[in-house]
Amino acid sequence: MKFTLSWLKQFLDTSASVTEIAESLTAIGLEVEEIIDKAADLQKFEVAYIVSTKPHPSADKLKICEVETKNGNLQIVCGASNARAGIKVVLANIGVEIPNGKFKIKESNIRGEKSCGMLCSEEELFLASESEGIIELPEDAVVGEPFTKYYGLDDPVFVINVTPNRGDALSVYGIARDLSAKGIGTLKELEIPAVKSTFSSKVKLNIKDKEACPLFTFREIRNLKNKPSPDWLQKLLKNIGVKPISSIVDVTNYMSYSFGQPMHAYDADKIGGGIVVDRHCEENVIPRLDCGISGEESVIQDPVVKPRDDNRGFHALNDKKYLLNKSDLVIKDENGVQALAGIIGGISSSCDSNTMNILLEAACFNAKMVAASGRRLQIDTDSRYRFERNIDRNFTEKALNIATDLILSICDGGEVSEILISGEKEPAKKTLDFPAGYLEKITGIKLTILLHNEANKGEFVGNTEHSIAAYKEVREDASTGLTPKLPLEASYVKGLNIKGIEAILNKLGFATDTEKDVIKITPPSWRHDINILEDVVEEITRIYGYDKIESIKLPELEQDNNRLREHKRISSFKRILASKGYDEVVTNSFMNSKDAKLFTELKDELFLLNPISVEDNYMRPTIVPNLLDIVRKNLARSIKDMAFFEVGPNFIGLNTEATYLTAILTGSYNSKNPHSIGRSYDIFDLKSDLETVFDYAGLSIEKCIVSNQATPLYYHPTRSVNLALGKNLLGHFGQIHPKILKHYDIKEEVFAFELNITNLPAPKAKFGKRDEFIISDYQANFRDYAFIIARDQPVGEIISYINNFNKKLVKSVILFDIYSGDKLPSGKKSIAIRVGLQADDRTLNEDDLNSFSKDLIANIEQKFQGTLRE
């Protein structure tokens, strides 16, 4: 939206500076994108006077002009057809840069004649897209002064960004109203002229689609002199980039920018029959309308059917042709379509310099239809821009009277008909009950309460922090005497009072009526975006000033160290597994109950009452089935080597869940190559990765209780274990049961671990802190032991025991063989273990090693009934 300072002052009595106006506009939500001051940009171009001209001796189209300037007369060669003696023109002296082309004027020789400057056109100064000659200035222009003063360029142009909900701000009058409410001047009272009709129009009006066109008004004006519009009007339009055409067209453009009401003028002599507003039809069925006094109902006689000519289309004012369809709303007569409603007029009924009689239209069209047609046909006009943001239907008839009065005054009078109207005005807006305390509730702006003291007729100042309830009690007790506690001038410092709220809303056009502590608010007809109390709060706040809202420090949130610690730990686990080659996935927390039944006993409380789909009707008891489903999909795409993990909740019961780190592994550890036969992943690869996670958490699998009793049924019964720390179950790891894999159509071995992060103990030291790593300078020694133990004895317990047997000496324990066969007693197995021994303070001698072996063998025999194999 563009407008000039002088245009604004037509409706706003203000002495505010350009800067103050711009700051206020931005503060009330009408962001100023740019202020164009062409006077500053073109101040070096001055007024000059052509004393005489003579033909150029070597060029027919050039003239040699003697030009009077402030520094004396100059000779300038000019090719403009309108260059002649006796006119004031715009001069660019030597050294001045021309905007269009960015070149500097130099003294030159043109076809043998000296030229000491340049006489400028509008096009060369970027004042118009094209021009036919040099600029001619008024006769009273003073030679040597900047030409901008006489061309109307000393009028700054505001360019503002209007949000889609503020169609009322697409008018200078609407902007003036907002600035007046902000306190930047006083809104001038708008005088609506009373235009008396001198004849009755015989043009009939028929609105076929009331929803598409809720209001259509027009009047006929005869015997006009369609001369160029006056300088003041041309300057306003030129400054905002609108090309002046003629008095009639310029007035319609002026009305659109001044009041936000698009208008259109038809050459009445080019209109046949009557006016019909309807959706475009496949075959142009144009009714021949009878003549007579217009009314709501029109008599349609003898329809004239004209076949549609797709090659011709609708010829618009932009000299382009458009093919219309049934969704387009058109204005037509018996000759065909004369305008695309709300968007653009047709060239066949356009006004020109010979136009004397017009039909002047002011209407309201459906915003969605206008927007849809404009988008489809790719036509952008000021009219469309306003209609698709809704206009004030209650102002349409007033706008028609203002425009009529302007046209009559500019075109030296004429004859006017009565206004022909079809449709209704905007119905009254819904009244909103606005509680006095609602403003503070939403924005924090404290409401100042003014109480009358009957004793001294003064005012008591209170705030909502003293509560409106207290105010009610005081007001209802007529006998209460109040002494002012704050000076009277402080009453408007801390906040608004109810009267202040009403004043703001009234200046914005809202009707208000206060009953006790509730303001009954009726939005004006031009505010289509005011529907709820929050909309009213926004209006009050933007005018009152966002900068006046008191800054309140947010309360400091207490940091939950446990949650923070868990979050850091989870992040570390993710990085560890990612470094091991795992990919993180995030899957749905819901699953099919049929699949869930394979993994756990179903619980009624975990069924979803309103599932997204029948396939996802159960809360997952474990993440494993989701990961298996990913494995199945990848195998179907010939991707065989996979390592995935996910951190997420497992749902145990109603309001009971635990966060699990779940990983799955399948495929080859390394593929076959010239240097290796390759091998597949096994359970020990998974165990190694789990040990790394445990190690970073400050734990050790060796310290856990390892048991293969009661592992989940979806694990292989003899190739899986539970991990516990005391009574806390930390998780499971092992090979997935073949029956489960068969259900998922997976033929490869799959290994998984599940770690219950919720049950992991907090590390005693700072998370991630390692003990100092010390390398002994003394000789390491290794001893191999073969023990015969019970077949069902877990080997891990023995390894864990040896690791903790003598921490000062034992550096490593490695299982390198397990044997069970006929050479051993029934129910027995043999294990071979290599123990690494090293002291930090000395070299171990034979006595030290023998003593260690003797004690270890004795303790293994006592604790595990294991005997040393000979």
From Swiss-Prot:
It is found in: Cytoplasm. GO terms for biological process: phenylalanyl-tRNA aminoacylation. It comes from Rickettsia bellii (strain RML369-C). Disulfide bonds: none annotated. Binds 2 magnesium ions per tetramer. Residues 450-498 form the RPE1 insert domain. Pfam families: B3_4, B5, FDX-ACB, tRNA_bind, tRNA_synthFbeta. It catalyses: tRNA(Phe) + L-phenylalanine + ATP = L-phenylalanyl-tRNA(Phe) + AMP + diphosphate + H(+). This is Phenylalanine--tRNA ligase beta subunit. GO terms for cellular component: phenylalanine-tRNA ligase complex.
